[in-house]
């Protein structure tokens, strides 16, 4: 599995600066259409290398990348050699959390793009719509490869996505999927045990509790 990084600083060296916003949006759009993870990076809060507060243009830039559907917004120089690394991180979190309040509820529109692409995407689409209709607290995805969590992530559900896997490399991959909370589970031999343990660790981690509505999405062959 591969992902794409939209490194605007490097792109600005290779193409005219005025073309960078167009290609950023196109790359994010194509990654979302093909379920590829996409990271938007470089010069996002660049002024915070020197100043404790960003410019309003930088705040808007970060928010627009999230509105466009990027999985990750990433700091670079701001935390690598800036004077205000913690402040930059906190500001990035605040922007993301505020912007995602507007994204919530858009899953029905986003899902229409994906629902006819494959059996797997159709199943994920139906699951997200069910979770939204039931106001579910979480969608629990037991997964061997991270594929189920990745597909569900691109549909931007209102519910938390909990990606459960026994494999560390899969858990690391799921860290960059939008809205996915990776949790490690034990290796089980039956589908029933896999699902049961996924629910147990989700509750132990505090993502769900007794009485919550939870949807379990598993593309594991039964």
Model-derived segments and their meaning:
Residues 148-150, 156-193:
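Nucleotide-binding motor/catalytic cores of P-loop/tubulin-like NTPases across gene-expression machines
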Residues 6-13, 62-84:
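Glycine-rich phosphate-binding active-site loops on the catalytic face of alpha/beta enzymes
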Residues 91-128:
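Long, charged amphipathic helices and adjacent flexible linkers at domain junctions
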Residues 1-42, 48-59:
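Conserved alpha/beta-domain cores
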Residues 210-211, 216-217:
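C-terminal binding/interaction regions
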Residues 1, 70-71, 136:
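A structural motif
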Residues 220-222:
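Conserved small/polar residues in nucleotide/adenosyl-binding loops
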């Amino acid at each position: 599995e591969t992902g794409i990084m939209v490194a605007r600083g490097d792109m600005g060296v290779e193409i005219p600066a005025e073309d960078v916003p167009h290609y950023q949006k196109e790359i994010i759009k194509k990654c979302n259409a093909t379920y590829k993870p996409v990271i938007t990076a470089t010069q996002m809060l660049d002024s915070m290398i020197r100043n404790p507060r960003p410019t309003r243009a930088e705040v808007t830039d970060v928010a627009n990348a999230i509105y466009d559907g990027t999985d990750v917004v990433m700091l670079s120089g701001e935390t690598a050699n800036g004077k205000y690394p913690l402040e930059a991180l906190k500001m990035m979190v605040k922007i993301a959390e505020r912007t995602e309040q507007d994204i919530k509820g858009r899953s029905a529109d986003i899902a229409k793009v994906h629902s006819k692409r494959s059996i797997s995407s159709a199943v994920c689409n139906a699951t997200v719509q069910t979770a939204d209709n039931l106001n579910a607290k979480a969608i629990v995805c037991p997964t061997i490869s991270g594929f189920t969590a990745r597909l569900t992530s691109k549909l931007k559900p209102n519910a938390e996505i909990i990606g459960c896997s026994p494999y560390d490399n899969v858990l690391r991959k799921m860290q960059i999927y939008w809205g996915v909370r990776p949790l490690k589970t034990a290796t089980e031999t039956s589908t029933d045990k896999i699902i049961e343990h996924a629910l147990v660790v989700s509750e132990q981690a505090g993502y769900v509790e007794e009485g919550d509505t939870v949807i379990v999405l598993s593309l594991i062959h039964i």
